[in-house]
Amino acid sequence: MSEPEVTSVVDMKSPNISSSCSFFKLKKLSEESLLQPPEKVFDIMYKLGEGSYGSVYKAVHKESSSIVAIKLVPVESDLHEIIKEISIMQQCDSPYVVRYYGSYFKQYDLWICMEYCGAGSVSDIMRLRKKTLTEDEIATILSDTLQGLVYLHLRRKIHRDIKAANILLNTEGYAKLADFGVAGQLTDTMAKRNTVIGTPFWMAPEVIEEIGYDCVADIWSLGITALEMAEGKPPYGEIHPMRAIFMIPQKPPPSFREPDRWSTEFIDFVSKCLVKEPDDRATATELLEHEFIRNAKHRSILKPMLEETCAIREQQRANRSFGGVLAASQAKSLATQENGMQQHITDNAFMEDPGTLVPEKFGEYQQSSASDATMIAHAEQGVDEGTLGPGGLRNLSKAAAPAAASSAASPLDMPAVDSGTMVELESNLGTMVINSDSDDSTTAKNNDDQKPRNRYRPQFLEHFDRKNAGDGRGDEKPIATEYSPAAAEQQQQQQQQQQQQQQDEQHLASGANDLNNWEHNMEMQFQQISAINQYGLQQHQQQQQVLMAYPLMNEQLIALNNQPNLLLSNAAPMGQQGIPAAAPAQPPPAYQNQHMHTQSHAYVEGEFEFLKFLTFDDLNQRLCNIDHEMELEIEQLNKKYNAKRQPIVDAMNAKRKRQQNINNNLIKI
């Protein structure tokens, strides 16, 4: 069991960074903390942005008061990749790699607790300042980044997604590697990897060509990152990513657009990173000895950049707070005017008992006076049902907006805004993963005390989702209070989700019913086919009995088919010889044609009269063929049955397999 380590940290002086503070610096979560529900261990502050496979939130560790970053990953995501990320982070203990503290399974979400880097990513800093970095700043950041790559590569780990968005800075100016969602492990039996993984613009040529790659693939990405920090975007950043994938292996290595602005040492450093032949490319250890890195200045030169970034965030926070207060003031003034307009009518109607809710028809309630016209109705789980005004529940939706705006204006309800850790790129350049690798899993604590009927989702996440909706860059907004107008929308969204879930369940149930109905219909069809076969057999037996009783009928039928006029010439002799008078005379040509036409539809229409006019050989041949024809029909029906049944069975097996994989991963953890 490990306890939080006490460390004194002196931050750089800035408008919103304390000059000196002493607090517990987390090193690893204790066993007691891992056994508790995560919401009892942490206080979630607000959302920072999006990382690979999940959203990242800023939180406070209650026991040590340390600020941490928590990635919440739904179990519906690729659990194998998530566990691989945890495994790699868990094995790393370096000041140049984001530290891993522990993880929880809370019902249907995985909570990954990591080190918090308050300055945010390099791409965030460039975006907020709206300018690129200087050469000295780039050298200092690349020095720490190379230290982190040396640490990983010595342990045969490939990051595979090096870019400015995955290089985080803390308030002390340390650069740390983050987001190991696509990292890989090289083993003794795996000299190189062949999977296409990474972000297209930063991807090495050998990764795109799938010819096998190793740790130096990160060096190519580092060179592209250096160009990104110097010019604001990677090479080919203005074209479509899929087109860039084809251009990177074919074109010469990229370089600076304006080389005159940069020193020869910096240009040479980038050229050694961007060597297309992996065997000729420099390693992280070799690049640490490069003149450009050896001449890098102390990280204290990053202080003005970090202070400027923090000042911009502080200004954005103040602007949002002022805008919220102004909007709340206007809403409050409007609400006062509306109450004043309705007060005269209310006073005339209810003068005796102000402030009392009196029953009205149909179970509704109406207030006696506008003096006490505001009452917040709290529903279960903190859902805001709005404001009860003079019109009672009928005016609920109209009065909810002013009250919610007034509530949202409270400074206590307006948390600090920070774009902090793992905020998505402005251009939304995601990480592309093609194919998959298999790596070992890691350790996490399962905190699923009891399985709920519906998926558990903390209420604060709904606020964050609404707050960040439509913001592709991950900028922060104040948390919506429980009295906000968005609360009603939240309740409506929850109802829609429940309805959708019920529809999905009904769809699955109907699918099972369809399968049962299909099997029942097939059984009925098989029974009908058997009945047809049995009927044909009975007809054949009856025909044989007739032929045995009248042996000359076969010869006469043959003669009838060969000579149509024979029946008329021999009608009297046949009667004299005892042939049954019921023997048919020669049918008219139209009648013959009709029966000839109906022969092909006999089994469909249920007409078997035409069999009387067939010869014994024809009947015998038809009897021999009917078994084969029935077998073909049964085979075709069986194929149709399997074609409709197999997709349902495959879907059910896939769900069982996926559930089994999740259970196996939980057991490993």
From Swiss-Prot:
Q: What is its EC number?
A: 2.7.11.1
State the similarity comment. Answer: Belongs to the protein kinase superfamily. STE Ser/Thr protein kinase family. STE20 subfamily.
- Enumerate the catalysed reactions: L-seryl-[protein] + ATP = O-phospho-L-seryl-[protein] + ADP + H(+); L-threonyl-[protein] + ATP = O-phospho-L-threonyl-[protein] + ADP + H(+)
Q: Where in the cell is it found?
A: Apical cell membrane; Cytoplasm
Give the chief site where it resides.
Answer: membrane
Keyword rRNA-binding belongs to the record: no
| UniProt modification remark | Autophosphorylated.
- Residues annotated as binding ATP: L48, G49, E50, G51, S52, Y53, G54, S55, V56, K71
The Protein kinase domain sits at 42-293
Protein name in the entry: Serine/threonine-protein kinase hippo
Which residues are reported to carry the modification Phosphoserine? S30, S33
Q: Which gene encodes it?
A: hpo
Tissue spec. comment = Expressed in CNS during embryogenesis. In third instar larvae, it is expressed throughout all imaginal disks.
Q: Which organism is it from?
A: Drosophila melanogaster (Fruit fly)
Q: Where is the active site?
A: D161
> What Pfam families does UniProt report for this protein, alphabetically?
Mst1_SARAH (PF11629), Pkinase (PF00069)
Please list the residue ranges that the record marks as compositionally biased, kind Low complexity: 490-503
Q: How does the annotation summarize its subunit structure?
A: Homodimer. Interacts with Sav and Wts. Interacts (via SARAH domain) with Ex. Interacts with Kibra.
- Residue spans with biased composition (Polar residues)? 432-445
| Gene Ontology BP annotations | border follicle cell migration; compound eye morphogenesis; eye development; hippo signaling; intracellular signal transduction; intrinsic apoptotic signaling pathway in response to DNA damage by p53 class mediator; morphogenesis of an epithelial sheet; negative regulation of canonical Wnt signaling pathway
Residue numbers of Phosphothreonine PTMs: T195
Protein induction? Transcriptionally regulated by Gcm (Glial cells missing).
The entry's function note states:
Plays a key role in the Hippo/SWH (Sav/Wts/Hpo) signaling pathway, a signaling pathway that plays a pivotal role in organ size control and tumor suppression by restricting proliferation and promoting apoptosis. The core of this pathway is composed of a kinase cascade wherein Hippo (Hpo), in complex with its regulatory protein Salvador (Sav), phosphorylates and activates Warts (Wts) in complex with its regulatory protein Mats, which in turn phosphorylates and inactivates the Yorkie (Yki) oncoprotein.
Q: State the SUPFAM superfamilies in the record.
A: Protein kinase-like (PK-like) (SSF56112)
